[in-house]
Amino acid sequence: MKVLVDIDEYAEGAVLLDGLESAIVGIVQEFGNGNRVLYSKQRILEILQERDLMTMGEAEEFYDYNILGLYAGEQNAVFLDQSLEPIKNKENEWEYHAK
């Protein structure tokens, strides 16, 4: 059963990015600080390309300067970059490869 959650109540005071609601993937909890909204970087880049007709390069530049670079207080949004893939090497140690 899915439960509808009001992000404003669940992460009261957290910064929400207008127009990027479909890129929300979760809530980050940090001891001593309020909850923050977690966005998928890859989904944000897809939205910018689809909605705003940006190239990947334009979307990445816009993301870096206008979204990642935004500071709106202690409950600023945080971003998940899933471009690394953990793989065990022959010595049974973890290595990380770009997807």
Language-model region placement:
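C-terminal alpha-helical interaction appendages
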Residues: 1-99
